[in-house]
Design a protein with these regions (language model features):
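Gly/Ser-rich, low-complexity
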Residues: 1-72, 88-97, 107-177, 216, ...
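Hydrophobic alpha-helical transmembrane segments
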Residues: 67-79, 196
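Membrane-embedded alpha-helices of multi-pass transport/permease systems
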Residues: 75, 120, 127, 184-187, ...
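Membrane-water interface regions at transmembrane-helix termini and the short interhelical loops
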Residues: 81-94, 182-186, 214-215
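Elongated alpha-helical scaffolds
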Residues: 102-105
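Alpha-helical transmembrane segments of helical membrane proteins, especially in multi-pass transport
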Residues: 174, 178-210, 224-246
């Protein structure tokens, strides 16, 4: 009778250990996959992300918004010329050199406006290059290896049947948290790209104000916003990398129950921080 009881207990322990390891291995595989996937998604340029949407945005920008921006530039340049002519005692002390300065300034403004789309894409090319380089370093340093899981399995084998059953039930909760994390990452990554497309579609209008002394702040703030949303991808990647390192430390801590709830806590923290990356990026670049 004791032999049968021991056999049944060992069989149940092996079953529960297998279930717990399956849940946690699925988690670690998911974490590794997410770091790699996010590195790809946030490191993708608008042109490469979706060619159809990119083509539509470019056509709208160049055929609908650019003519309006041309009118804005005309008004801004004319207004600045009138101001320049009147500010020197109603032209009594006017310097002819100012006309050449105005002509040069206006020519630069026209050049910038006609190359608006290339300038905007250059911003995202720079951020994409940085994110791609960082993604390779981060992904390589946060992989959760099979050796780490073997250490965890060894600690599980020393536990009794009751704690193992409770741990298996708790580990099942991880699937729900990972599902929620996947939704948050999807919304954030895809929402960021849609924001990039929206910013790009109206780019000529703020760029038309860059050369003016008084309203040039609009164009400067627009450029800051572009850099902020571009490098937001870097902050997203860093958040996920920190999460992966923290999970890596939990898995190898030797405390399976603490690992389960630690992962849940870190997942909630990650979701919270991911939504703050946009605001942090704007503060870094002074955009508002």
């Amino acid at each position: 009778m004791d032999f049968l009881t021991d056999w049944l207990t060992n069989w149940l322990k092996e079953l529960l250990i297998g279930g717990i390891m399956g849940n946690l291995e699925g988690l670690t595989d998911y974490v590794n996959a997410q770091v790699g996937e996010i590195a790809v998604q946030v490191g993708t340029t608008p042109a490469a992300w979706n060619a159809g949407v990119f083509s539509l945005i470019r056509q709208l920008s160049e055929t609908v918004i650019l003519p309006i921006a041309g009118l804005v530039l005309t008004f801004v340049a004319t207004y600045e010329l009138i101001q320049m002519l009147l500010e020197k005692n109603n032209m009594h002390e006017f310097d002819v050199a100012n006309i050449y300065k105005w002509m040069f300034k206006t020519a630069c403004a026209i050049l910038i406006l006609s190359n608006t789309f290339n300038i905007v894409m250059a911003v995202f090319d720079v951020s994409q290059s940085v994110i791609t380089q960082a993604g390779g370093l981060i992904q390589g340093s946060t992989d959760i290896t099979p050796d780490m899981m073997t250490e965890l399995e060894t600690s599980l084998e020393g536990m009794d049947l009751g704690p193992l059953l409770g741990l298996w039930l708790q580990s099942s909760i991880i699937g729900v948290t990972m599902w929620a994390l996947g939704i948050v990452i999807f919304v954030l990554v895809y929402g960021r790209m849609l924001e990039i497309y929206l910013l790009t579609s109206l780019a000529p209008i703020p760029m038309a104000t860059l050369a003016h002394r008084e309203v040039g702040q609009t164009g400067q703030n627009y450029l800051r916003s572009l850099f902020a949303v571009g490098f937001q991808g870097m902050l997203i990647l860093v958040c996920v990398a920190i999460y992966a390192v923290l999970v890596q430390g939990i898995v190898t801590s030797g405390d399976p129950i603490g690992a389960i709830w630690g992962i849940v806590g870190y997942t909630v923290l990650l979701c919270f921080m991911l939504f703050k990356t946009g605001g942090i990026a704007q503060r870094i670049f002074g955009a508002h």
